[in-house]
Amino acid sequence: MIRYKGFILFLLLMLIGCEQREELISNLSQRQANEIISVLERHNITARKVDGGKQGISVQVEKGTFASAVDLMRMYDLPNPERVDISQMFPTDSLVSSPRAEKARLYSAIEQRLEQSLVSIGGVISAKIHVSYDLEEKNISSKPMHISVIAIYDSPKESELLVSNIKRFLKNTFSDVKYENISVILTPKEEYVYTNVQPVKEIKSEFLTNEVIYLFLGMAVLVVILLVWAFKTGWFKRNKI
């Protein structure tokens, strides 16, 4: 009997010592999950991917670092949206819409593509672009185009150079926009303070995945059922255990 009690105690200790993880975000693509994990690990937060099949990929972190992980995702504006494909914006089998609607969709796609391109500039963490354009089908008196940019950056020493690079990039993108009609607002990245909240003092086992945990739980339930059956049938008395 002592052996069975010891085995059950061992299983309980293993379950208590399992590393507690919490789902940070789900329904991600492989690229989005990799970007999130890269940012988290650069700030000493351990994260892992879990493939959910058709539901996409989820990212899990330890419960003690969940709050810090959420703050980092907000600071870096993660997850980044999927790359915009013009062919997806205008599929060949879609109904023909008005020229006004087609123009609005086109400029919306252009704005998203430009936002993705600006992140490639060194120092830019995330960017939002708004392009003013005339939706009228007959541009008899077309208004001059204006472009506004809000960018979050992490290199304050090169802020002036960053503004110049962004303006030059947008000026070369649109041939009919004037340099003075491009406005750029830079916002410095928030200071990050790492917080690691440990709810309980626990023994961590990196090799214990969810599948292993479920296996141990199943084994524990099976042992309990066998013990109950043995007591009811008098098996221990017959075998003098």
From Swiss-Prot:
The UniProt keyword set, sorted, is: Cell outer membrane, Lipoprotein, Membrane, Palmitate, Plasmid, Protein transport, Signal, Transport, Virulence
Q: Which GO terms describe its biological process?
A: protein secretion
- State where it is primarily located: membrane
Topology relative to the membrane: Lipid-anchor
InterPro entries assigned to the protein according to its UniProt record, in alphabetical order: AMP-bd_C_sf, FliF_N_dom, T3SS_SctJ, YscJ/FliF
Q: Name one Pfam family in it.
A: YscJ_FliF
Where is this protein found? Cell outer membrane
Signal peptide residues on this chain, from the entry's feature table: 1-17
Q: Where is the lipid attached (N-palmitoyl cysteine)?
A: 18
Lipid modification (S-diacylglycerol cysteine) maps to 18
Which PANTHER family would you find in this protein's record?
Answer: FLAGELLAR M-RING PROTEIN, SECRETION SYSTEM APPARATUS LIPOPROTEIN SSAJ
User: Main role?
Assistant: Involved in the secretion of the Ipa antigens.
Family named by the database record:
Belongs to the YscJ lipoprotein family.
Provide the protein name. Answer: Lipoprotein MxiJ
Species this chain originates from: Shigella sonnei
